[in-house]
């Protein structure tokens, strides 16, 4: 969560402030939620936040976190199976990507008071590496 708060602090301010943030994990997104709240921003009215993982706590944040659900248990089983095959000396091919789904909750909405219209390109502010 601290990584999300640190990333939030590096975002541009004022008119260049992003209207949405897609985080690498729910834990980072929860940190962004807290930092946005501390900065006086309203989520989702001023800033939309999306996490990744769909951890159980994502449904209990305020507001509830929109997130990308991944099949974590299936991912673990697949990793274990591939590891065992490699340890047995078998040739392992890359598996097909596992499916994900968007779980829309309360942390996302259209930008409020935005002059952007549907289909208009928005600016990519950049990636922030968190540690």
Question: Predicted segment positions?
Answer:
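Flexible loop/turn connectors
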Residues: 5-119, 123-126, 130
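Short beta->alpha junction loops
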Residues: 1-2
């Amino acid at each position: 969560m601290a990584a999300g708060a640190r990333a939030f602090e590096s975002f541009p301010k004022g008119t260049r402030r992003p209207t949405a943030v897609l985080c690498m994990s729910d834990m980072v997104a929860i940190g962004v939620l807290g930092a946005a709240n501390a900065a006086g921003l309203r989520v989702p009215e001023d800033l939309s936040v999306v996490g990744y993982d769909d951890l159980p706590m994502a449904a209990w944040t305020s507001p509830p976190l929109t997130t990308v659900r991944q099949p974590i248990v299936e991912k673990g089983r697949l990793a274990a199976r591939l590891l065992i095959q490699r340890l047995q000396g078998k040739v392992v091919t890359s598996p097909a990507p596992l499916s994900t789904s968007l779980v829309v909750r309360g942390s996302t909405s259209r930008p409020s008071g935005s002059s952007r219209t549907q289909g208009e390109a928005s600016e990519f502010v950049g990636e922030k590496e968190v540690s």
